[in-house]
Regions:
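N-terminal Rossmann-like dinucleotide-binding module
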Residues: 1-61
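C-terminal helix-rich "cap/oligomerization" subdomain common to oxidoreductases
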Residues: 1-15, 81-83, 119, 305-346
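Hydrophobic residues in well-ordered beta-strands that form the structural core
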Residues: 27, 67, 84, 106-107, ...
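A general structural signal for well-ordered alpha-helical segments in protein cores
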Residues: 28, 32, 44, 54, ...
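Beta-loop-alpha module in the N-terminal Rossmann-like domain of NAD(P)-dependent dehydrogenases
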Residues: 61-123
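Rossmann-fold dehydrogenase core element
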Residues: 119-137, 157-161
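Predominantly a Rossmann-like dinucleotide-binding segment in NAD(P)-dependent oxidoreductases
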Residues: 138-218, 340
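NAD(P)-dinucleotide binding in Rossmann-like oxidoreductases
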Residues: 215-222, 231-302, 319
Length: 346
């Protein structure tokens, strides 16, 4: 009797071994622990210019190797991919160095100090053939997949307006976000979130933008900002701040309804998320529907999706071209705040 053929199953993907550049708070408190919870993203090394910090972080997190220089980690043959959470002005130089060593790179947002600098990183990616992406972790969260599906289904009719806000309070003079030469300021740090979300949801680039910024008189970084983006299909408004109460929200308005995203950007890994859908017909502004999403670690999901792209499955969640588009908008907003005119992203 002939043997029955066994069903074909895809072999498991080979894990991507990660090295971490720097012992930044986001790396030590969020990204490394998240990656360590996935078999796809083992963290094998961490580097700091202060070897003591690298060893302390490695010991605390159970990372096998600690290096006292970024070069040593990048040149480690057992590292497949680099996570780069260094200060903003070091994103592109060290990402290029890693790419030239044959390492894939997941670089923290904002990717660069300008769109022109982002183009340099695109050139390095194209020369080396490695995968490089920007770390907008919220794009991996299931709530945003649901929002995009609702928009595709026409649940709110035609999307016409995206309104976003992200702020926190931080006046620490030692914080890298308060150093202008290092790419500090609220627009670069948190204003980039509602901007990238609006571009992602509209699926197009803004034709022109206008913005207003208020600067801290001591640190000389923008501490409060707002802007308007005009797209071919609609508009987006945003506000951001680094010296106002912590808050985040995104609202989408269409011709037939709206969607309210309660915690759009940085929900805690143990915190469930909700979106609200209003068809505009409920009396007194009552929300017609609430959709809940179980708690997930979006940093883990981000690492897994990027690693899958490295292994040829799927694509990098936020491409360099997408990141460059976001920087072009931010560049134009800085110009607009000075010129007090509408500016065209370029």
């Amino acid at each position: 009797m002939p043997k029955r053929a066994q069903p074909f199953t895809e072999p498991p993907l080979v894990p991507v071994r990660w090295g971490i550049l720097g012992a930044a708070h986001i790396a030590v408190s969020k990204v490394i622990p998240a990656m360590q919870r996935s078999a796809m993203t083992p963290v094998v090394a961490i580097a700091s210019r202060d070897i003591g910090k690298a060893r302390a972080a490695a010991r605390e997190l159970g990372v096998a190797r600690a290096y006292g220089s970024y070069e040593e980690l990048i040149d480690d043959p057992d590292v497949d991919a680099i996570y780069n959470p260094l200060p903003n002005h070091l994103h592109v130089p060290w990402s290029i160095r890693a790419a030239e060593a044959g390492k894939h790179v997941l670089c923290e947002k904002p990717l660069s100090l300008s769109a022109a600098e982002a183009r340099q990183l695109i050139g390095a990616r194209d020369r080396t053939g490695v995968q490089i992406g920007e770390a907008f972790m919220m794009r991996a969260h299931p709530q945003w997949a649901a929002v995009r599906e609702l928009l595709a289904e026409g649940r709110v009719g035609e999307l016409k307006l995206v309104a976003g806000h992200f702020s926190y309070f931080r006046r620490d003079p030692t914080d890298v976000r308060n150093v202008p030469e290092w790419g500090g300021g609220a627009l670069m740090d948190v204003g980039c979130y509602p901007i990238t979300i609006a571009r992602w949801l509209f699926g197009e680039e803004p034709l022109e933008v206008t913005g207003m910024l208020e600067y801290d008189p001591v640190y000389n970084v923008d501490r409060l900002g707002s802007g308007l983006l005009r797209f071919p299909s609609g508009q987006a408004t945003f506000s951001s701040g680094s010296q106002v109460v912590h808050y985040q929200r995104v609202q989408l308005f269409g011709t037939e309804g709206r969607i309210d995203v309660e915690i759009p950007f940085s929900p805690a890994a143990d915190h469930a998320c909700r979106i609200f859908i209003d068809d505009g017909l409920a009396l007194g502004g009552a929300l017609a529907e609430e959709v809940q999403f179980p708690a997930v670690d979006q940093y883990r999901l981000q690492g897994e999706r990027f690693s899958e792209a490295v292994r040829g499955v799927g694509h990098v969640p936020t491409t360099l071209e997408d990141a460059m588009g976001n920087m072009a908008v931010i560049d134009a907003l800085f110009r607009s705040a000075k010129s007090r005119r509408w500016e065209v992203p370029e």
